[in-house]
Amino acid sequence: MSAFQRLCLFWLVYMAALGIFFPFYGLYLGTHAGLSAIEVGAVLSMLPLVGLAAQPFWGHLADRTGARSHVLAAVTICAGAAQLLLGHAYGFVPLLVATALLALFHTSVMPMALSVSLAVLQHDGRHAFGIARS
């Protein structure tokens, strides 16, 4: 499988996972997890708040080591594992902590994937970035 095909597959799986999970996460927290509206807001606020620190950390690590694709793979796997933990978190505090853990990894996947994609496509100029992401 070529690098371009791997990129297309990554973006397909990643965007499908985002589209399946995030539109319903807030609904799940409010209806099935039994959180109040304020608690749902607090849990969902973990994503951007933790992302403020996590994105620069993972980006710096990837740039410093020069192993962007390896860091991207590790962060993506950890984000998937953290997402699985959400199914075992019951109550406000466990869901808050589990969502913060998810955010620690998940919020860095998109920026790193964009960086890796553009670096790969730079060497193979025949493919447009939009095609890889679609």
Predicted features and spans:
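Helix-breaking motifs and short loop linkers at transmembrane-helix boundaries and internal kinks
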Residues: 34, 66, 88-90
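Helix-loop junctions at membrane interfaces in 12-TM secondary transporters
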Residues: 2-4, 87-99
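Residue-level signal for conserved functional micro-sites within the alpha-helical transmembrane segments
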Residues: 18, 48-55, 106
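Helix-to-loop junctions at the C-terminal end of transmembrane segments
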Residues: 53-67
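Structural signature of the two symmetry-related core transmembrane helices
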Residues: 70-84
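Helix-loop boundary and gating motifs at the non-cytosolic
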Residues: 1-48
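Hydrophobic transmembrane alpha-helices of Major Facilitator Superfamily
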Residues: 16, 20, 88, 92, ...
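Cytoplasmic helix-loop-helix junction between adjacent transmembrane helices
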Residues: 100-133
